[in-house]
């Protein structure tokens, strides 16, 4: 908002000089680059993790306990605020973390960088992808997959030639929603 006001008020005329000065700053360029890197990485990882959880829930037969555990684990980040997940990562995997220091004996671990942010953001946002992709997988016509199986296709071939192409718009949507968040 201040940039917009300065672009009008600066010398009395509207101009883009203030924006040129801001975009020329190396720290601003680095911040934008890091933001885009984190966004793309988190979008891709969240979509893949959401796809994995949705696929297992819809297609894989698991016991009631494992299925219930899967649902709880996938929905837990939705009901807890993101700062709780961040704090949990710090308490478990930080320099004095329970897992890093006491179980693994690692004393110089840092979760405050690029990868720590990417992991926490992925764990925070993948349930959104999971819910979107689960609905998509449930609505795929099973007769299309059965026809491919009847023609002799393996499970992998059915997934790559029937299921995945039908899911590509939903995967793109899940990526974009996560990237924007």
Model-found features: residue ranges?
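A short amphipathic helical element positioned immediately N-terminal to and/or at the very start
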Residues: 14-23
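Charged/polar positions on well-ordered alpha helices
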Residues: 41, 149-150
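Glycine/proline-centered hinge or cleavage motifs at structural transition points of membrane proteins
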Residues: 151-152, 165
């Amino acid at each position: 908002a201040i940039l917009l006001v300065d672009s009008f008020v600066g010398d009395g005329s509207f101009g883009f000089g203030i924006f040129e000065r801001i975009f020329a700053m190396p720290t601003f360029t680095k911040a934008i680059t890091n933001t885009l890197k984190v966004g793309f990485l988190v979008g891709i990882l969240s979509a893949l993790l959401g796809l994995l959880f949705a696929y297992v829930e819809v297609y894989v037969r698991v016991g009631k306990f494992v299925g219930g555990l899967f649902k709880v684990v996938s929905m837990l980040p939705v009901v807890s605020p993101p700062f709780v997940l961040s704090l949990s990562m710090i308490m478990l995997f930080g320099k004095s973390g329970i897992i890093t220091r006491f179980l693994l004996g690692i004393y110089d671990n840092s979760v405050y960088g690029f990868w720590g942010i990417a992991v926490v953001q992925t764990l925070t946002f993948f349930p959104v992808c999971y819910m979107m992709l689960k609905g998509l997988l449930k609505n795929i016509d099973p007769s299309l997959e059965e026809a491919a199986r009847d023609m002799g296709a393996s499970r992998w071939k059915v997934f790559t030639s029937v299921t995945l192409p039908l899911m590509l718009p939903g995967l793109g949507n899940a990526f974009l929603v996560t990237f924007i968040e």
